[in-house]
UniProtKB/Swiss-Prot annotation:
EC number per UniProt: 4.3.3.6, 3.5.1.2
Family to which this protein belongs: Belongs to the glutaminase PdxT/SNO family.
Reactions this protein catalyses: aldehydo-D-ribose 5-phosphate + D-glyceraldehyde 3-phosphate + L-glutamine = pyridoxal 5'-phosphate + L-glutamate + phosphate + 3 H2O + H(+); L-glutamine + H2O = L-glutamate + NH4(+)
Organism: Frankia alni (strain DSM 45986 / CECT 9034 / ACN14a)
UniProt lineage: Bacteria, Bacillati, Actinomycetota, Actinomycetes, Frankiales
This protein's record includes keyword Lyase: yes
Pathway note: Cofactor biosynthesis; pyridoxal 5'-phosphate biosynthesis
Subunit architecture: In the presence of PdxS, forms a dodecamer of heterodimers. Only shows activity in the heterodimer.
Keyword terms, alphabetized: Glutamine amidotransferase, Hydrolase, Lyase, Pyridoxal phosphate
Annotated active site: C81 (nucleophile), H175 (charge relay system), E177 (charge relay system)
Function: Catalyzes the hydrolysis of glutamine to glutamate and ammonia as part of the biosynthesis of pyridoxal 5'-phosphate. The resulting ammonia molecule is channeled to the active site of PdxS.
Protein name as it appears in the record: Pyridoxal 5'-phosphate synthase subunit PdxT
Length: 199
């Protein structure tokens, strides 16, 4: 049985690293740059990068509205760092014209932990991930300022939610693709399979 085809939005960010994590857990990574490709994948990863830039690129490549429609239609999506911001309902300190995909009933704060020099690493217990704590890398990371009742908080740093799930949507403020630990990718692939999208 072949693994699910998981698209990776390949406009900016850690595309290769996410592809490696997905391959490690038996998925088939596919780079996505066009709206038509969304119909060819069982799930989608929104990698880290700069959320405002990625949002603008989504508009340039005419992907924003198709992505919103895909999320509403139930496409499983995993957003890390900037991807978490893009999946939020609102951003506290974002630009007023920040394009968002939405889908997660939450408000996030960009760069909540500070600037690049304030980046840090920490071991986190993540609900749904078995084994030792997940080593999490935070780089100009957001956090969840407010989450709706349907949002399940999977991990926190100093009481701030940094990993969440709502239905088939998963988001982390940290970069699981940078550590060589593919358990967050495994969690997402399990979500894809349980949603009926996976092969």
């Amino acid at each position: 049985m072949s693994g699910p085809r998981i698209g990776i939005l390949a406009l900016q960010g850690d595309v290769r690293e996410h592809a490696r994590g997905l391959t490690d857990v038996g998925a088939q990574p596919v780079e996505v740059r066009r709206a038509a490709q969304l119909a060819e994948v069982d799930g989608l990863v929104l990698p880290g990068g700069e959320s405002t830039t990625i949002g603008r690129l989504l508009q340039v490549f005419e992907l924003l509205e198709p992505l919103r429609a895909a999320v509403v239609a139930g496409l499983p999506v995993f957003g890390s760092c900037a991807g978490m911001i893009l999946l939020a309902r609102d951003v506290v300190d974002g630009r007023p014209d920040q394009p968002l995909i939405g889908g997660l009933d939450m408000v996030v704060r960009r760069n909540a932990f500070g600037r690049q020099v304030d980046s840090f690493e920490v071991d986190l217990d993540v609900d749904g991930v078995e084994g030792p704590p997940v080593h999490a890398v935070f780089i100009r990371a957001p956090w969840v300022e407010k989450a709706g009742d349907a949002v399940e908080v999977l991990a926190r740093v100093a009481e701030a939610p940094v990993a969440v799930r709502q239905g088939s949507l998963l988001a982390t403020a940290f970069h699981p693709e940078l550590t060589g630990d593919s358990r967050m990718h495994r969690l997402f692939v399990d979500i894809v399979r349980s949603s009926g999208s996976g092969r």
